[in-house]
């Protein structure tokens, strides 16, 4: 079975890596929509129109489901995508529920792009789960874009993370929600400054579980046959699905995309696509 995974750049590879690690038998087509990046600076209407076009691309790829591995695209445009296709659509929402449950000091920070930080959906989730917790919603206009340009922008990324982390330390934050899929790519930089006492939450496991639930609901016979075949194969290499990397910008960023994929041996191709 083939699944489409998309983001504005490299961030969604945190989700792709989690899916491939947990369910390596799935074929994955990844779209980095670099030509339209950064999503965080676009209007709601622009993002809705773009996501509908992305949906058409994945329909032509004959995928069984689409994972919108981008918080900004999820909060701004996932409803428009769902209205345009019959494929199962899985989004990424800020993992605020587990954050409030884990926070011992009841002091939580949510770090997002401006579009996500200002979205009604994020505020709804916070109001639903925060109870008596202090919540600091923080945003960066440049961090996701700079992560896409890594390693040339490494020092700029480190400076931004240093500034954000110092603000969190000043507020005595003990739980951080990374509400942009780019940010877990540099999670170790947050950990170096915030230390072991700050729990850092990201959504990849939850999104992976939701994908499998939706595939099982939508394609019960296909999933049953696939899992039966996987369980009976003695050679685990036969269960290895493929990863195909696509970019709307061209081959300029392919080396960067490749560098963030954990199972590089599963990459079977790279393509420039027009959206």
UniProtKB/Swiss-Prot annotation:
Gene3D superfamilies referenced in this protein's UniProt entry, alphabetically: 3.40.50.1860
EC number from the UniProt entry: 5.1.1.3
Alphabetical list of InterPro entries matching this protein: Asp/Glu/hydantoin_racemase (IPR015942), Asp/Glu_race (IPR001920), Asp/Glu_racemase_AS_1 (IPR018187), Asp/Glu_racemase_AS_2 (IPR033134), Glu_race (IPR004391)
Residue numbers binding substrate: 7-8, 39-40, 71-72, 181-182
Biological processes, Gene Ontology terms: cell wall organization; peptidoglycan biosynthetic process; regulation of cell shape
A single MF term (Gene Ontology): glutamate racemase activity
One Pfam family from the record: Asp_Glu_race
Pathway: Cell wall biogenesis; peptidoglycan biosynthesis
Classification via PROSITE patterns: ASP_GLU_RACEMASE_1, ASP_GLU_RACEMASE_2
Active site feature: 70, 180
Record's keyword terms, sorted: Cell shape, Cell wall biogenesis/degradation, Isomerase, Peptidoglycan synthesis
Catalytic activity: L-glutamate = D-glutamate
EC class of the enzyme, as a word: isomerase
Family: Belongs to the aspartate/glutamate racemases family.
NCBIfam families attached to this UniProt entry: glut_race
Function: Provides the (R)-glutamate required for cell wall biosynthesis.
HAMAP family the UniProt entry points to: Glu_racemase
UniProt-recorded name of the protein: Glutamate racemase
Source species: Marinomonas sp. (strain MWYL1)
């Amino acid at each position: 079975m083939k699944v489409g995974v998309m983001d504005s750049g490299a961030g969604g590879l945190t989700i792709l890596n989690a899916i491939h690690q947990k369910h390596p038998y799935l074929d994955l087509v990844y779209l980095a929509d670099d030509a339209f990046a950064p999503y965080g600076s676009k209007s709601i209407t622009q993002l809705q129109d773009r996501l509908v076009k992305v949906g058409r691309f994945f329909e032509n790829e004959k995928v069984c489901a689409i994972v919108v591995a981008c918080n900004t695209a999820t909060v701004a445009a996932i409803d428009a995508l769902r209205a345009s296709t019959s494929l199962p659509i899985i989004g990424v929402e800020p993992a605020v529920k587990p954050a409030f449950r884990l926070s011992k000091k009841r002091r939580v920070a949510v770090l997002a792009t401006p579009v996500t930080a200002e979205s009604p959906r994020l505020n709804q989730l916070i109001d639903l789960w925060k109870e008596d917790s202090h919540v600091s919603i923080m945003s960066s206009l440049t961090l996701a874009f700079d992560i896409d340009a890594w390693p040339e922008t490494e020092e700029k990324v480190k400076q931004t993370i240093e500034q954000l982390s110092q603000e969190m330390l000043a507020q005595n934050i003990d739980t951080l929600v990374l509400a942009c899929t780019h940010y877990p790519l540099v999670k170790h930089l947050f950990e170096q400054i915030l230390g072991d006492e700050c729990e850092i939450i990201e959504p990849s496991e939850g999104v992976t579980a939701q994908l499998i639930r939706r595939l099982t609901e939508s394609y019960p016979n296909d999933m049953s046959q696939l899992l039966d075949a996987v369980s009976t194969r003695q050679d685990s290499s036969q269960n290895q699905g493929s990863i195909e990397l696509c970019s709307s910008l061209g081959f300029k960023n392919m080396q960067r995309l490749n560098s963030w994929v954990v199972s590089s041996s599963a990459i079977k191709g790279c393509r420039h696509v027009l959206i």
